[in-house]
Each structure stands twice: as structure tokens, then as C-alpha cells.
């Protein structure tokens, strides 16, 4: 799980050529990297409140502490009970709890650890059910179907958001209005405001783990992905947000947007890694490698020019594999599968498994992998077909079918599907689900009966920008 202790100011708005803002971002990070941890909560003066405050402080601190992956089942159950008790106290007390959280980092760590334990428990429970060998654990899990249940976790996150009125506050800020005017009694307290804010990022993550990628992106409607966003002050939250947004875009076949998200955070990490503590950088290195695998997949579907830093690293990590992905064909299938398995989130099922019929329990990862591989197989011959179409301005359908050794009608169906897939929504502004429909390919065609009309629209490389960028790096 992510356990970063230092944060950086967020990056630029998503402009592909904004190198100046990226440099400013790196400089801002250097200034803030000296953060040494959380400050102690101020003690309440009233002696009658001292014991209660000490108890709350210990519970707040414990909620942010990571649980060992190999912890026994009893410990996982106890951790769930502790979270339920803490969130019940925060949400259902008579009025808002009058405590200041130690820092932004604490609020993120609590939500992050809460979701990590939920994810870990669901994966563990599904694995025990599919194996069907440990009768003692099966009986314990069967008797507690609601422990770390999907409904309970979502209820906590939505309740924190609703209590804090954080969506209303963010909407007011986007309208340049005073957020405190709509915050209410709870939202005016930083404890609720920060927990509510990071619960939105948590919902993005949970909905993505459940496979609802549209709803995952919808949860961020009121959060602007720019350097002023609160999540950008916490490195772990910054990284997590862009990973799950990018992955959701990829699964929705919006590859240009996915590449933009992955590129943004990869450039940010490459420019700040020398200023991060070793433990922090080690903790994000795995996710960093996962993003390179995902961007390799996206570039295979949507060839595009990448930042030189990313392009070089991608060639070093996946040189031969990347070439096979871009060539397509049957030999690319195992590489797509390997990269997806290594880079995807640890998907979970929204319902408890069937302990009585282990063979009926489907691994959520295998389910989403099969959906992804169907898309890969649909586009498998796209590079080969394009290589023929580029040689002509008009071409007979039967002639192309002869080259490819397929039936003409089967080829016609594939061409129509591929043309439809080439029309992608590209994000420009407002919500992450919004955008304008663009042609994602540099090759377009239209069919008139059996005659294929082909047009090629290449975007010339901006040589001036390339020279200026490389001259600046040289001198």
C-alpha cells in the first residue's frame, strides 16, 4: 500500500507542453520536502475532557497506522470494529467533534489505510472461498458477511462527504464564492473538511476497484485536477488520484486521456525523485513501474508522441515488448495480458463469495482481464490493416480481404467497428466524463459500397519546441 510521508504541491493544469509549470512544480516540492511529520494535538484545558481527548487522540493515531498484510483474521476483524467505532463517534456525536487533525497527511493516511484494509480483506476472503480448504476460516467468514462489507465502506465515505458538505464547498470555490457560507457546522471544522475531501479520492479508488469506472470519474466532478487542489499537497494522494483516473480512462477506451494522466504524474515523479526521502521513493517505485506498463498499453492502442523523459524510460523498460504491442497480431496477446496483470488494481467483488460452491466464485481480476482482452482481440489486426490502407487513397474491399486472408464481410464488420472505436471523447474542461469527440487515429476512411476511401492526416512534429527544449537541457 502507499505509505508516503511527504507531499508536494500539485502539478500544472493538464497542458501537454507546460514544461515551465512542471519546473515550478519541482521547485515547490524542494521547498516542502523537509516536512518531518505530524504535530501533536493541542490538549483540551478542561480536566473533565482530558481522558476523553487522550482516548480520541490515540484512536486517531491508530487509524492511520498500517496493518500488516499477514495479520491473523482476528486482528482484521478487530481493526474493522475500531474503524466503525471511530467513524461512528465522528459522524454521530451530538454536534461536530471539536478536534483539529494533526495534518493533511493524517486525514489521507486514515482514508488510505481504511480502503487498503477493505481491499486486502475482500481479496483474502475471495481467495479462501475459491480454495475451499480451510474450514475453520470459512466458518468464521461465513458468520460475518458484513465485516468489511462493500456497503459499510461506501456508507462511511459517502457519510463523511455529506457531513462535511465538501462537494458544496468545492462547487462554491469554483464559482469564486466563500466556501464557509455553505460548509455548515460540520464542514467548517477542518477534521470533517479534510476527511470529507479525501473520502472523494477514496470513492474514486473504491468504485474503480469494483469496476464502475464511469462512477469513479463522476465522483471527482467538483475537484479540479490542478496544482491548487488539496490532494496535490500529499504525494500519496497525488499519485493515487492520477493512477486511478488514468486507469479508469483506459478501461473506458479513452486512451488519449489516460496517456495524459499517466504522463503528468510520471513527469512529476521523475523531476522530484531526487528530493524525496529514500523510504518514500521506494514506496512509490512499484506504482511508478505499473504506470509505465499502462502507458505502454495505451500507446499501443493510441500511438502518440510522448514526453522525451517518458519515451526514453519506456524504451528502456519495455523496448521489445513495446514493439510487439505496436505491431499487433497474435504474438501481442500474451504481452498485453502480462502487462495488465502486473499493472491493474487489485479488483474486488461487491458481494461476499459463495462458500458452499467454491467453483462458482470468479476471481475479479480474471473477470476484468477477460473484458480487457476482448478489446485487445478486437483491435489486434489494426496495425496490419493500417499498413495496407496507408499505401492507397482508394481500395477495393475484396482486394484488402485477399491481402489479409479473411472473408470480405468479416472485414467490412471489422472496419466499421474500428472506425467507431477511433472516435473517442477527449477531456477538455469541466467533469472528467465530459469532453469533445475527436478522431484518435492519424488515418481515416469511409466506405462506399465495396470501395474504401482513405485519407491520412498526420500532425507534424513541432521541431521548434523540440529544439528549444533540448537546447535548454544542454546549456
Curated annotation (Swiss-Prot):
Its main location: cytoplasm. GO terms for biological process: formation of cytoplasmic translation initiation complex; translational initiation. It holds the Pfam family Paf67. The keyword Iron-sulfur does not apply. InterPro entries: eIF3l (IPR019382), PCI_dom (IPR000717). Keywords: Cytoplasm, Initiation factor, Protein biosynthesis. One of its GO terms (cellular component) is eukaryotic 43S preinitiation complex. One of its GO terms (molecular function) is translation initiation factor activity. It is found in: Cytoplasm. Residues 257-451 form the PCI domain. Belongs to the eIF-3 subunit L family. Component of the eukaryotic translation initiation factor 3 (eIF-3) complex. Component of the eukaryotic translation initiation factor 3 (eIF-3) complex, which is involved in protein synthesis of a specialized repertoire of mRNAs and, together with other initiation factors, stimulates binding of mRNA and methionyl-tRNAi to the 40S ribosome. The eIF-3 complex specifically targets and initiates translation of a subset of mRNAs involved in cell proliferation. This is Eukaryotic translation initiation factor 3 subunit L.
Amino acid at each position: 500500500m502507499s505509505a508516503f510521508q511527504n507531499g508536494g504541491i500539485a502539478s500544472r493544469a493538464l497542458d501537454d507542453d507546460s514544461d515551465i509549470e512542471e519546473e515550478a512544480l519541482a521547485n515547490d516540492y524542494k521547498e516542502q520536502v523537509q516536512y518531518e511529520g505530524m504535530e501533536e494535538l493541542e490538549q483540551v484545558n478542561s480536566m473533565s475532557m482530558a481522558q476523553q481527548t487522550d482516548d480520541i487522540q490515540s484512536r486517531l493515531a491508530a487509524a492511520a497506522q498500517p496493518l500488516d498484510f499477514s495479520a491473523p483474521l482476528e486482528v482484521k476483524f478487530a481493526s474493522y470494529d475500531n474503524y466503525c467505532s471511530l467513524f461512528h463517534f465522528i459522524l454521530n456525536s451530538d454536534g461536530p467533534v471539536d478536534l483539529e487533525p494533526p495534518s493533511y497527511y493524517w486525514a489521507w493516511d486514515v482514508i488510505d489505510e481504511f480502503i487498503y484494509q477493505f481491499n486486502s480483506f475482500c481479496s483474502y476472503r475471495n481467495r479462501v472461498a475459491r480454495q475451499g480448504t480451510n474450514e475453520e476460516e470459512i466458518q468464521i467468514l461465513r458468520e460475518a458477511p458484513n465485516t468489511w462489507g462493500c456497503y459499510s465502506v461506501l456508507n462511511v465515505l459517502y457519510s463523511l462527504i455529506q457531513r462535511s458538505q465538501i462537494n458544496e464547498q468545492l462547487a462554491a470555490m469554483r464559482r469564486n464564492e466563500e466556501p464557509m457560507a455553505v460548509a455548515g457546522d460540520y464542514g467548517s471544522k477542518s477534521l470533517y473538511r479534510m476527511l470529507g475531501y479525501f473520502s472523494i479520492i477514496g470513492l474514486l479508488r473504491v468504485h474503480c476497484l469494483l469496476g464502475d469506472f464511469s462512477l469513479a470519474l463522476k465522483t471527482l466532478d467538483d475537484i479540479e485536477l490542478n496544482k491548487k487542489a488539496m490532494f496535490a499537497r500529499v504525494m500519496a494522494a497525488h499519485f493515487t488520484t492520477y493512477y486511478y483516473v488514468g486507469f479508469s480512462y483506459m478501461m473506458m477506451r479513452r486512451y488519449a486521456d489516460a496517456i495524459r494522466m499517466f504522463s503528468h504524474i510520471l513527469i512529476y515523479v521523475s523531476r522530484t525523485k531526487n528530493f524525496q526521502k529514500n523510504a518514500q521513493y521506494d514506496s512509490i517505485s512499484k506504482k511508478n513501474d505499473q504506470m509505465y506498463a499502462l502507458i505502454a498499453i495505451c500507446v499501443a492502442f493510441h500511438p502518440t508522441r510522448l514526453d522525451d523523459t517518458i519515451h526514453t524510460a519506456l524504451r528502456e523498460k519495455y523496448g521489445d515488448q513495446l514493439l510487439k504491442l505496436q505491431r499487433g497480431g497474435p504474438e501481442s496477446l500474451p504481452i498485453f495480458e502480462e502487462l495488465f496483470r502486473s499493472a491493474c488494481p487489485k479488483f474486488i467483488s461487491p458481494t461476499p463469495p459463495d462458500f458452499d460452491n467454491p467453483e462458482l466464485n470468479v476471481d475479479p481480476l480474471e473477470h476484468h482481464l477477460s473484458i480487457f482482452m476482448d478489446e485487445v482481440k478486437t483491435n489486434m489486426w489494426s496495425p496490419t490493416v493500417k499498413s495496407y490502407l496507408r499505401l492507397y487513397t482508394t481500395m477495393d474491399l475484396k482486394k484488402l480481404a485477399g491481402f489479409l486472408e479473411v472473408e470480405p464481410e468479416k472485414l467490412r464488420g471489422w472496419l466499421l467497428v474500428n472506425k467507431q472505436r477511433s472516435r473517442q471523447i477527449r477531456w477538455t474542461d469541466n467533469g472528467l466524463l465530459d469532453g469533445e469527440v475527436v478522431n484518435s487515429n492519424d488515418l481515416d476512411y469511409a466506405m462506399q459500397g465495396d470501395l474504401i476511401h482513405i485519407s491520412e492526416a498526420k500532425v507534424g512534429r513541432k521541431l521548434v519546441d523540440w529544439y528549444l527544449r533540448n537546447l535548454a537541457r544542454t546549456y
